[in-house]
Amino acid sequence: MSNSKLVSYITSDFQTKSDMKVGEVEWEKIMNKNFDKFKKAGAVRQTVTQIWNKEGALRLGHLWEYKDEKAFVECQKIFREAELEFKNKTGIVWKVFSNRGIVLYDVNYQ
């Protein structure tokens, strides 16, 4: 059973395949640089996926898990800084769509 109480599922749409690849690499660098900040703020886990079942879509999925609502709020502050750094560093235009939820139950099949 995970310690996560809240999750965010964020999709990021890109205009070109190159933008998506560069965006993935640069975002990972920024996230790694901020690893300790996110951990201290209460982030539990991050998973990044490339969406493959939407024809013509250049989309990444970001699943974030948080230990509680306070952790979510604190991590949002770090995200704002990270998004600004990403924009300034890459100039890539991306559309971001966020979905958030409270964990009702969690099943681990391993």
Language-model regions: role of each:
Residues 31, 43, 66, 75-78, ...:
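Extended interaction regions within the primary functional domain
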